[in-house]
């Protein structure tokens, strides 16, 4: 679960120009669902912010 969260978080930052995520989870997998991915990323960031 932690690896999945870290990967989503990584790709979330990638959407804003951040570094790419790990190669084990290519951004292409999320093509067409960036909005959902962004929501998940923001949710994860919210948890880590607290």
Curated annotation (Swiss-Prot):
Full protein name: Cytochrome c-555
PTM summary: Binds 1 heme group per subunit.
Alphabetized UniProt keyword annotations: Cell membrane, Electron transport, Heme, Iron, Membrane, Metal-binding, Transport
Mitochondrion keyword on record: no
Membrane topology: Peripheral membrane protein
Presence of keyword Transport: yes
UniProt-annotated location(s): Cell membrane
SUPFAM superfamilies documented for this protein: Cytochrome c
Provenance organism: Schinkia azotoformans (Bacillus azotoformans)
Main location: membrane
Molecular function as annotated in GO: electron transfer activity; heme binding; metal ion binding
InterPro entries: Cyt_c-like_dom_sf
Cellular component, GO, one term: plasma membrane
Highest taxon listed in the record's lineage: Bacteria
Residues bound to heme: 7, 10-11, 25
